Design a protein with these regions (language model features):
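Pan-zinc metallopeptidase signature
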Residues: 97-168
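Conserved phosphate-interacting/catalytic interface
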Residues: 63, 67-79
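Auxiliary, metal-adjacent structural segments of Zn-dependent hydrolase domains
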Residues: 1-37, 58, 75-89
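Short, charged/polar micro-motifs that form catalytic or ligand-binding hotspots
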Residues: 30-38, 118-125
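Catalytic Zn2+-binding segment of zinc metalloproteases
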Residues: 37, 43-63
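Secondary-shell segments that build the walls of catalytic and ion/ligand-binding clefts
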Residues: 74-102, 107-108
């Protein structure tokens, strides 16, 4: 189910869309059609993630790749910012890390800093958002670059999509 409109959680969290209780909530205030498509695909990725947790995270490979990327990013950030102490070990969503990246660093600056490490600034937020950005890249991005930059994530997505296709 997809609901389009203005929802309190969007204003509270300053977001355009979210996935909750098997439904996607998306704002009707979009820059253009592609912006809405990107938001929908991103939230579909969270639905796929929720229903395939063991496959995605069971072997720990994706978490290790994510943390390795955070460890590459941390010294770059620490040149100008006070990086949270658990930044290099915490792969789960953490409000203080999210606030640090969004409010202190800012996504414009972070997009410049994370080039070649993460596919986008938002992918640095948590392993779940890393997964979601990878999902977007498979459908809307440069697959070859993504495959080189995020090999574990790319392989997980390719295997899961193949399995889902075979079972439908």
């Amino acid at each position: 189910m997809i609901y389009v409109g203005q929802f309190p959680e969007m204003k509270e969290r300053d977001i355009n869309a979210y996935y909750e209780n098997d439904a996607i909530y998306i704002t009707n205030k979009q820059d253009d059609e592609m912006d809405m498509i990107e938001d929908i695909i991103h939230e579909i990725s969270h639905a796929v993630e929720q229903h395939n947790q063991e496959f995605i995270y069971g072997d720990g490979g994706l978490q290790r790749e994510f943390i390795a990327k955070r460890r590459r990013l941390s010294p770059l950030l620490s040149q100008k910012y006070d990086v949270p102490s658990d930044f290099n070990i915490n792969f789960e969503y953490d409000r203080s890390i999210d606030d640090f990246l969004f409010r202190d660093v800012g996504y414009d600056a972070l997009n410049q800093i994370c080039v070649g490490i993460f596919p986008s600034a938002y992918a640095c937020t948590s392993v779940s958002e890393y997964w979601a950005k990878g999902f977007e890249e498979v459908f809307l991005g440069d697959k070859d670059n993504f495959k080189q930059q995020c090999p574990v994530l790319y392989k997980k997505l390719a295997l899961l999509l193949k399995e889902l296709k075979e079972n439908t």
